[in-house]
């Protein structure tokens, strides 16, 4: 009798121990899954940083082709059109590369034929303000007003109204929440950049040496599947650098495309996905 009771007690204890081990194992397994999920989420939250050390909004997931991630580079040129723009367009045409141009209103008036050519050759034409004046655009709050005026000038030349703007000096810190709300209300979009070519820094340097530095800056920064490159077609060294940049980007596997309104993805220093 006593032996039977002891046997029953031992069996119960064994069952409890097994249950405890199973519970501990499942809890541990759950912790592992939780930790993995946490690590995965942290990895997904990593964001790229621009050359001016300002982190960007997440980029659009790269498209795939034949199982490979497509690498796309967007050459963008601010402040034109100008006296070097025709030469730049010749280079782009020769290399079968597309670009995005952000125009100053006064230059739209001065070079309407270049605006037409940019559009006709498959490039995107967007707005870069009327004055390029920080105080007027941001402190006095005229960002949208100037972009709409610039938009109207472009529409007068091309017969269509683009929506993409490039903030003079970048969107941070000037494009505050109130101005961003106004951007959204007016149906405009904003693009900053992922790579700053720093082309303007070399205005006093000999053109060949300056262009070599610009090529180096761009290719060194091109490490992600999607890159948006800031340049200016009003500087001779910038235009001189373009063939080398295109060659280097193609060697890295990039395709050179123009912005497409139907495939817009947010790219601004404020992480504001509305614009």
Summary of predicted features, one role per range:
Residues 219-258:
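Catalytic grooves of carbohydrate-active enzymes
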Residues 251-275:
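Low-complexity, Gly/Ser/Thr/Pro-rich intrinsically disordered linker/tail segments
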Residues 47-138, 142-157, 248, 255, ...:
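Active-site beta->alpha N-cap acidic-glycine motif
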Residues 1-33:
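Sec-dependent N-terminal signal peptides of Gram-positive bacterial secreted proteins and lipoproteins
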């Amino acid at each position: 009798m006593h032996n039977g009771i002891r046997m029953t007690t031992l069996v119960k204890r064994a069952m409890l121990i097994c249950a405890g081990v199973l519970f501990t194992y499942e809890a541990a397994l759950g912790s592992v899954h939780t930790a993995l999920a946490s690590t995965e989420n942290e990895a997904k939250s990593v964001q790229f940083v621009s050359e001016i050390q300002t982190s960007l909004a997440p980029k659009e997931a790269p498209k795939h082709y034949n199982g490979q991630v497509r690498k796309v580079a967007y050459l963008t040129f601010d402040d034109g059109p100008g006296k070097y723009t025709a030469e730049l367009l010749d280079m782009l045409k020769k290399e079968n590369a597309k670009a995005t141009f952000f125009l100053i209103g006064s230059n739209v008036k001065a070079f309407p034929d270049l605006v037409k050519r940019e559009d006709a050759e498959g490039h995107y034409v967007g707005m870069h303000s009327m004055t390029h004046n920080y105080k007027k655009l941001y402190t006095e709050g005229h960002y949208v007003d100037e972009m709409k005026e610039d938009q109207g000038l472009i529409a007068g030349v091309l017969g269509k109204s683009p929506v993409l703007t490039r903030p003079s000096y970048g969107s941070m810190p000037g494009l505050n929440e109130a101005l961003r709300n106004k951007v959204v209300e007016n149906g405009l979009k904003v693009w900053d950049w992922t790579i700053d070519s720093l082309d303007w820094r070399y205005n006093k340097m000999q053109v060949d040496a300056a262009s070599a530095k610009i090529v180096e800056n761009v290719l060194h920064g091109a490490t992600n599947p999607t890159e948006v490159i800031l340049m200016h077609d009003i500087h001779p060294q910038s235009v001189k650098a373009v063939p080398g940049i295109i060659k280097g980007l193609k060697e890295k596997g990039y395709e050179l495309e123009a912005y497409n309104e139907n495939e817009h993805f947010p790219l601004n220093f404020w992480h504001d996905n509305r614009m």
